[in-house]
UniProtKB/Swiss-Prot annotation:
Compartment(s) of residence: Periplasm
Origin superkingdom: Bacteria
Signal peptide: 1-25
Full protein name: Thiosulfate-binding protein
Gene: cysP
């Protein structure tokens, strides 16, 4: 019986080196929210260097995908093979379990602080000299004030804005729901443009010149102030505010299929390291490391934070009550059009 000698021919040295080089190269895709580009552009290179150092020179490349976090989660459910998610809303991570079983039910317990390596709150960006004299949420319902923030239907950023405004009004009105709804109707009526994501809202305010106040994460408004320094924007942090957590997770089914589980876990754990936490505060995000926050105290004004769960119940309840079709948001928008 003839033997096909070609099948038994050993690989050449060049071929073996090529295969070895391919085996050592790892690529991660980080699916993130719309306004995190600059943060991860700063975080990724030092981790890539640390990975090479810890893994015998193996090369790791981290690629980024950015959009509104809800749109990002939907893209993964539709087939985007992201290895890790770094979002600004718990529900946008949870849906990867609920709708796709891509992560386990207990994903939030796998990393510290409910898998949230950093957090933020809401800030107001006003034009030079604060011409509309904006200081707190109550100033945002005046008839002469025009607001810019994304659509809460598509943006986690905007959902926090909506809930922060509702919570502040609820506190001010002593829990009178009718008064809070009246406040929220005018608040939403004052929105000049609803963009789909936070970065679009930034462009509308800073480049198109629309609106008197841009509402976004404290981190985002501070970075915009620096980016557009010539325009003299000013940042206002209201007295009552919301705790906005930024949950992260490796996408189990994807990392197993991609062979990237080790790198994905190492990457997200590294976000809690002193090096990463320090970089994070440079971009005006708050962290749960008191030593690092103490060194950056001048960046972060004191504000009274409330948790979504304390004021509104669980996130599934929040989504059903406020943001589902026919929910409170839709009712308030309809009332504002009358």
């Amino acid at each position: 019986m003839a033997v096909n000698l070609l099948k038994k021919r050993p690989l050449t040295l060049a071929a073996m080196l090529l295969l070895a080089g391919q085996a050592q190269a790892t690529e991660l895709l980080n699916s993130s929210y719309d306004v995190s580009r600059e943060l991860f552009a700063a975080l990724n290179p030092p981790f890539e260097q640390q990975w090479a150092k810890d893994n015998g020179g193996d090369k790791l490349t981290i690629k980024q995908s950015h959009a509104g976090s809800s749109k990002q989660a939907l893209a993964i459910l539709q087939g985007l093979k992201a290895d890790v998610v770094t979002y600004n809303q718990v529900t946008d991570v949870q849906i990867l379990h609920d709708k796709g079983k891509l992560i386990p039910a207990d994903w939030q317990s796998r990393l510290p602080n409910n898998s949230s390596p950093f957090y933020s709150t809401m800030g107001f960006l006003v034009r030079k000299g604060n011409p509309k004299n904006i200081h707190d949420w109550s100033d945002l319902v005046r008839s002469d004030v025009k607001l810019i923030f994304p659509n809460p239907k598509t943006s986690g950023n905007a959902r926090y804005t909506y809930l922060a405004a509702w919570g502040a009004a609820d506190n001010a009105d002593g829990g009178d729901k009718a008064k809070t709804e009246q406040f929220m109707t005018q608040f939403l009526k004052n929105v000049e443009v609803f963009d789909t994501g936070g970065r679009g809202a930034t462009t509308t305010f800073a480049e198109r010149g629309l609106g008197d106040v841009l509402i976004s994460f404290e981190s985002e408004v501070n970075n915009i102030r620096k980016q557009y320094e010539a325009q003299g924007f000013e940042v206002v942090i209201p007295k009552t505010n919301i705790l906005a957590e930024f949950p992260v997770a490796w996408v189990d089914k994807n990392v197993q299929a991609n062979g990237t589980e080790k790198a994905a876990k190492a990457y997200l754990n590294w976000l809690y390291s002193p090096q990463a936490q320090t970089i994070i505060t440079h971009y005006y995000y708050r962290v749960n490391n008191p030593e690092i926050m103490g060194k950056q105290a001048d960046k972060f004004p004191q504000t009274e934070l409330f948790r979504v769960e304390e004021k509104f119940g669980s996130w599934p309840e929040v989504m059903k009550t406020h943001f589902a079709s026919g929910g409170e948001l839709d009712k308030l928008l309809a009332a504002g059009r009358k």
